[in-house]
A protein has these predicted regions:
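Active-site regions of metal-assisted phosphoester/phosphodiester hydrolases
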Residues: 1-136
Length: 136
């Protein structure tokens, strides 16, 4: 979140987000290089507070680059890079992402729901879900 800690003068805009991105990349890179886990199948999913569809719609450019380069370098692939504003007429981009190790592949298209007008929605974000299978 861009303004985390800004109003309290505890951080600059995007400062905490950039630190969180760097921490995630470091943790996952360490995990992938650990001999105990080097062959593990890993799914990382959550709110990354950045669009990865090429639009630069939301997020910090430096953090976005470090996230993509770091996780790709650690052997992860992102399954939520689709520009759903173009392909599915959504009103906002995906900021919640699903990353997996290369040995996990989607078995069907990405599921996305974007109904911001639904009275019982749980988030202001688009929902994303994906069915995966281990690569044979």
């Amino acid at each position: 979140y861009a303004m985390d800690g800004v109003r309290q003068k505890a951080a600059l805009a995007w400062e905490r987000h950039q630190k969180a991105v760097d921490d995630v990349v470091a943790d996952l890179s360490d995990r992938r290089s650990d001999p105990e886990f080097v062959d593990s199948r890993i799914v990382v999913a959550g709110d990354f507070n950045t669009s990865l569809d090429g639009s630069n719609w939301y997020g910090h450019p430096g953090a976005r680059s470090r996230l993509v380069e770091g996780l790709n370098g650690a052997g992860f692939q992102c399954h939520t890079r689709e520009n759903i504003r173009l392909t599915r007429a959504a009103d906002r981009a995906i900021v919640d992402h699903i990353w997996t190790t290369a040995d996990l592949l989607p078995v069907e298209p990405l599921h996305i729901w974007c109904d911001r007008s639904h009275p019982n929605r749980l988030s202001d974000h688009n929902g994303v879900a994906l069915s995966l299978a281990a690569k044979e």
